[in-house]
Amino acid sequence: MASQGTKRSYEQMETGGERQNATEIRASVGRMVGGIGRFYIQMCTELKLSDYEGRLIQNSITIERMVLSAFDERRNKYLEEHPSAGKDPKKTGGPIYRRRDGKWMRELTLYDKEEIRRIWRQANNGEDATAGLTHLMIWHSNLNDATYQRTRALVRTGMDPRMCSLMQGSTLPRRSGAAGAAVKGVGTMVMELIRMIKRGINDRNFWRGENGRRTRIAYERMCNILKGKFQTAAQRAIMDQVRESRNPGNAEIEDLIFLARSALILRGSVAHKSCLPACVYGLAVASGYDFEREGYSLVGIDPFRLLQNSQVFSLIRPNENPAHKSQLVWMACHSAAFEDLRVSSFIRGTRVVPRGQLSTRGVQIASNENMETMDSSTLELRSRYWAIRTRSGGNTNQQRASAGQISVQPTFSVQRNLPFERATIMAAFTGNTEGRTSDMRTEIIRMMESARPEDVSFQGRGVFELSDEKATNPIVPSFDMSNEGSYFFGDNAEEYDN
């Protein structure tokens, strides 16, 4: 990408740092996850969790949600100004699961937000450590991406359920900063913009006055984030039009939906990071590992290494398959919900199946579920190989526009062929090339038509043995040409409801 000089690496975004060299980045990312680990250990002490209970992913998620809620300034302010019955704005909590007499019990815990903030800052050398909070948000977002489908949200904004592979990060909170923006898919950004434009259409004052000025700045910033994800001049030119529109309305919505469709072939660049549950970092810190000294990267071998020797448990409902639960969490840990299943299976070393075939519901347990019948089992989060995470859309030829995989947003920088039926996608582009952006639309359609399915993405890139930490010997897998594996085929997952 041409603008590489101005871009910070996404480790730098993650740690809020200015330009740093590789060693400094590794150290500051290490400091960030080490802080999460120290916080987790302290919370386990506060809650008097046994070693086993501290390794339970459901407890980890509750503790993560508590600290995110404690630092959610906007919501805290809102809660204080709009007191609702039975909700103390100064407290946060959630379900903690304990093992009693061979059974799992649920216990609701409540803490002062102030107290949680104190523990978090103490674990992070007295700083607010926003980067660590964003890291936890991205882990929750990756878990949602693997667990739920967003068909309803897509349809509500006038998009097509087939665009689900563009929806990475769609549940990330607004406050997730630059690191959050980097991992959002094209569809997610389009959806946020469409929602904004629709509000402007329905509410005359949305763009007016002092508030409207702030809204406008946010709108243009989101347009620029989305523009930066596109890799072709024509797509970017349409984004300039959308951004500069005096009074954004239906024409802009049309343009955005057109761009989202085009991104099915001309993929945008979306970052991928392996963000692990807090308990995993806690286990490592407790065993004496010094993240800051050793350094850590979210996009290299480190997360794979960490998962090779961490034992994490999960509660299992009576008719769930523990192996499937493991697959769900493995995909979330590596941000691989939108990756080609052929690639994921090869790296993991066991077959990764589409979501429609999983006998497992989400990881979190609802408060009305019966604990009597709950069991727990070990999550198998190890892998056979490791691979470098990518931020490119996997288009075959970066110099000029070319094809990426249709129902896939690549996570791993690993060579794969592009088995796709271009005709099925091109059908979505019949007609409608009129209006201001007609020449750009025509250009985009032409590029998509000339995309060749026989090309390969990430040419020559391979996976590595777990002993090969310097990535010296790439093993380039060969895949069955015929079927691209999308995780979402035959989907029957629950919808994401906030």
UniProtKB/Swiss-Prot annotation:
Keyword RNA-binding found: yes
Localisation per UniProt entry: Virion; Host nucleus
Posttranslational modification: Late in virus-infected cells, may be cleaved from a 56-kDa protein to a 53-kDa protein by a cellular caspase. This cleavage might be a marker for the onset of apoptosis in infected cells or have a specific function in virus host interaction.
Family in the record: Belongs to the influenza viruses nucleoprotein family.
Motif Unconventional nuclear localization signal per UniProt: ranges: 1-18
Motif Bipartite nuclear localization signal, residue numbers: 198-216
Protein name: Nucleoprotein
Span list, region Disordered: 1-21, 79-98
Entry coiled-coil feature ranges: none
Assembly, per entry: Homomultimerizes to form the nucleocapsid. May bind host exportin-1/XPO1. Binds to viral genomic RNA. Protein-RNA contacts are mediated by a combination of electrostatic interactions between positively charged residues and the phosphate backbone and planar interactions between aromatic side chains and bases.
Gene Ontology biological process terms in this record: symbiont entry into host cell; viral penetration into host nucleus
Keyword RNA-binding: yes
SUPFAM superfamilies xrefs: flu NP-like
Any one annotated GO CC term: viral nucleocapsid
Role of this protein: Encapsidates the negative strand viral RNA, protecting it from nucleases. The encapsidated genomic RNA is termed the ribonucleoprotein (RNP) and serves as template for transcription and replication. The RNP needs to be localized in the host nucleus to start an infectious cycle, but is too large to diffuse through the nuclear pore complex. NP comprises at least 2 nuclear localization signals that are responsible for the active RNP import into the nucleus through cellular importin alpha/beta pathway.
Residue stretches of biased makeup (Basic and acidic residues): 79-91
This protein's UniProt keywords: Capsid protein, Helical capsid protein, Host nucleus, Host-virus interaction, Ribonucleoprotein, RNA-binding, Viral nucleoprotein, Viral penetration into host nucleus, Virion, Virus entry into host cell
Species per Swiss-Prot/TrEMBL record: Influenza A virus (strain A/Duck/Germany/1949 H10N7)
